């Protein structure tokens, strides 16, 4: 199985890219959101990947974070949801948006993705609601995937121009994971904690871990 690819971006299309890894080109299918976030042609790129092998088909799907990869795997496990629909959902909402929608039972947001009807959206939310806390707690990002990428590729192709440096790990995913961990340590159940953190993150997308914890605790406090 191929779990991650690091190489140079050779070509991009409307739904896939070609990544050159030591002279071997890999076609990787991605969501619209992931495609938009990738660097330019000729630059170093790293993607987490999921490989699908069937009798008549072998495909690689690429993701910017471990959470996105896990949501793809889970979405494809739902009856009536294939890789194309999964990528449409991730492209429309992003992994954080999928986490929020499923944790909050917001099937209307899931339905906003191309090719997703109301029944399928409701089934997704119902089947995956218990999975949201675990995915939201994942902290792997593309920045972590890029660690060492420059050195590896430059050894292979020393004449190539140096790529842009990857941003340090962190951001909304790390804040969400930290907030979930804190609420779990305080004794809150996974589903309640995930719903509270998801709502807090939706109301304040730029909030850090501490602010998310405070906001989630207010939401979880008994109503008088």
Swiss-Prot record:
GO terms for biological process: DNA recombination; DNA repair. Residues 171-224 are annotated as: Domain III. GO terms for cellular component: cytoplasm; Holliday junction helicase complex; Holliday junction resolvase complex. Disulfide bonds: none annotated. InterPro entries: DNA_helicase_Holl-junc_RuvA_I, Hlx-hairpin-Hlx_DNA-bd_motif, NA-bd_OB-fold, RuvA, RuvA_2-like, RuvA_C, RuvA_C_sf. It comes from the Bacteria. Its main location: cytoplasm. Keywords: Cytoplasm, DNA damage, DNA recombination, DNA repair, DNA-binding. Residues 1-64 are annotated as: Domain I. The keyword Lipid metabolism does not apply. It is found in: Cytoplasm. Pfam families: HHH_5 (PF14520), RuvA_C (PF07499), RuvA_N (PF01330). Residues 65-143 are annotated as: Domain II. One of its GO terms (molecular function) is four-way junction DNA binding. Residues 144-170 are annotated as: Flexible linker. NCBIfam families: ruvA. Belongs to the RuvA family. The RuvA-RuvB-RuvC complex processes Holliday junction (HJ) DNA during genetic recombination and DNA repair, while the RuvA-RuvB complex plays an important role in the rescue of blocked DNA replication forks via replication fork reversal (RFR). RuvA specifically binds to HJ cruciform DNA, conferring on it an open structure. The RuvB hexamer acts as an ATP-dependent pump, pulling dsDNA into and through the RuvAB complex. HJ branch migration allows RuvC to scan DNA until it finds its consensus sequence, where it cleaves and resolves the cruciform DNA. Homotetramer. Forms an RuvA(8)-RuvB(12)-Holliday junction (HJ) complex. HJ DNA is sandwiched between 2 RuvA tetramers; dsDNA enters through RuvA and exits via RuvB. An RuvB hexamer assembles on each DNA strand where it exits the tetramer. Each RuvB hexamer is contacted by two RuvA subunits (via domain III) on 2 adjacent RuvB subunits; this complex drives branch migration. In the full resolvosome a probable DNA-RuvA(4)-RuvB(12)-RuvC(2) complex forms which resolves the HJ. Has three domains with a flexible linker between the domains II and III and assumes an 'L' shape. Domain III is highly mobile and contacts RuvB. This is Holliday junction branch migration complex subunit RuvA. It comes from Ruegeria pomeroyi (strain ATCC 700808 / DSM 15171 / DSS-3). The lineage of its organism: Bacteria, Pseudomonadati, Pseudomonadota, Alphaproteobacteria, Rhodobacterales.
């Amino acid at each position: 199985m191929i779990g991650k690819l690091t190489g140079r971006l050779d070509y991009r299309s409307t739904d896939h890219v070609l990544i050159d890894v030591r002279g071997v080109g890999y076609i990787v299918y991605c969501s619209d959101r992931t495609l938009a976030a990738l660097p330019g042609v000729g630059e170093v790129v790293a993607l987490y990947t999921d490989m699908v092998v069937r009798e008549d088909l072998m495909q690689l799907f690429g993701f910017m974070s471990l959470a996105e990869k896990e949501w793809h795997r889970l979405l494809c496990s739902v009856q009536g949801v294939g890789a194309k629909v999964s990528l449409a959902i991730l492209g429309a909402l992003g992994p954080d948006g999928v986490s929020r929608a499923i944790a909050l039972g917001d099937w209307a947001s899931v339905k906003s993705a191309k090719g997703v009807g109301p029944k399928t959206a409701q089934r997704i939310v119902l089947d995956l609601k218990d999975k949201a806390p675990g995915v939201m707690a994942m902290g792997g990002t593309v920045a972590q995937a890029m660690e060492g990428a420059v050195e590896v590729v430059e050894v292979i192709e020393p004449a190539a121009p140096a790529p842009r440096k990857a941003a340090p790990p962190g951001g909304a995913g790390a804040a969400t994971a930290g907030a979930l961990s804190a609420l779990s340590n305080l004794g809150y159940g996974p589903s309640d904690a995930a719903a509270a953190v998801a709502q807090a993150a939706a109301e304040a997308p730029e909030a850090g871990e501490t602010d998310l914890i405070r906001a989630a605790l207010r939401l979880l406090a008994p109503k008088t």
